[in-house]
Amino acid sequence: MVREGRIGAREVAEHAGCSVSAVSLVVNGKDTGRISAELRERVLAAVTELGYRPNRSARSLVTGDSGTVCAVLPDPANPFFGDVLAGLGTALGDEHTLALVLPTSGTDYDARTVLRAYSLDPAGVVLISPGEPVLRDLVPRCPTLVVDAPGRTPALPRVDLDTVAAGELISDHLTALGHRGFGYIGPTSDKPTFRTRRRAFLDRVADADVLRTLDLPGWDPLAAAVTMASVLPEWLDSGVTAVVCADDLLAYGVLAALDRLGRGEVAVVGMGDLPFSQLCRPALTSVDFAGRRAGEVAGRSLLSWIGTGERPRRTRVPANLVVRASTRGG
């Protein structure tokens, strides 16, 4: 007979004819080799019949696992971060709750944002594309893993996007098409990921006939289009025939500016391979950083760390160049 009111571990134990500790082992997934298979099945049957749901707060006192993983990210409106979160959520499954911690203003976070994440007493934290000051000042309070912060990340396991390969893939593709004059557009950002993207490409084309660079203060494609409409004429007159952007959002602005100028023959490449890149005209050639895959790897690594106490190794997720019409190769 099912009792009214909240069902607890004691009721499950009575129903299954076992101890409360046996119930705890089963519901926390720690029963392997410690109780019989027959007892495990009895406990699971009682859990199902009674509709028992473990009290997460009580469980955290015993296991040290609050059941919450915090993801700290810069800009929730950027579809790339949505891909990372989707992969992270898939890896965490039903066992952990994914809590998003966002900047209170602007499109980037600082050390205070990370402190807000730690104040939730999470089982683990994932920092997505953090800036240099965040990494420099960070004092981890629980298993903390970084996604997309290449370079010297002190004392933190990380999942890297292959930003170095991105520069190589783009430069090899464009030079194979005969381009010798390049423009590069990036953000005014302290983030390691954008420094690496910039350096990887510019080092690869250091002997180009023409090389122009520009840093923009934001990611708004419309603002980028306005700025580039005034900059591109000089670039093109100097011999620039291909423009590379550190992010697809900037590339959309470049495509719009080129369309306004009637210079559709200029090649444009982005990074991130956002969903809209297939739909814009011309369709944008872009580097796919496999954001969903990076999120899955980060989630699995963090869960293993939480469960075993063993720090995961650094992982790099391969990048791939998706060639489309904007470089006349697709």
Regions inferred by a protein language model and the residue ranges of each:
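N-terminal helix-turn-helix DNA-binding module of bacterial transcription factors
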Residues: 1-64
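Alpha-helical structural signal in soluble globular domains
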Residues: 46, 87-91, 196-207, 253-261
